[in-house]
Curated annotation (Swiss-Prot):
This is Histone H2A-like 1. It is found in: Nucleus; Chromosome. The gene is H2al1a. Testis-specific. In contrast to other H2A histones, it does not contain the conserved residues that are the target of post-translational modifications. It comes from Mus musculus. Belongs to the histone H2A family. Keywords: Chromosome, Differentiation, DNA-binding, Nucleosome core, Nucleus, Spermatogenesis. GO terms for biological process: cell differentiation; chromosome organization; spermatogenesis.
Length: 105
């Protein structure tokens, strides 16, 4: 009697699980805020990767600022200092008028 070969089916994995990126958050934000229904998954993947890259770099630099001032936590002022002192980040955030609120603690 021949043994029947059983195929093991892989469980479906979401884009977030495969890429370890928060696609669903970016997708929902873009669709709600900009009413965009023409977003491809590759566009979401690219945008999410760019946002993650920028965030990690800013937080790394802000962590160094906090550490040099003898603190263990990153404060909003550390993020603001990083953006102000880095020419590329300053240019990136300049057109949109994005700023860090100094009153947040």
């Amino acid at each position: 009697m021949a043994k029947k070969m059983q195929r093991r089916r892989r469980q479906k994995r979401t884009r977030s699980q495969r890429g370890e990126l928060p696609f669903s958050l970016v997708d929902r934000f873009l669709r709600e805020e900009f009413h965009s229904s023409r977003l491809s998954s590759s566009a979401l993947s690219f945008l999410t990767s760019v946002l993650e890259y920028l965030t990690s770099n800013i937080l790394e630099l802000a962590g160094e600022v906090a550490q040099t001032t003898g603190r263990k936590r990153i404060a909003p002022e550390d993020v603001r200092l990083v953006v102000q002192n880095n020419e590329q980040l300053r240019q990136l955030f300049k057109p949109g008028g994005t700023s860090v609120n100094e009153d947040d603690n």
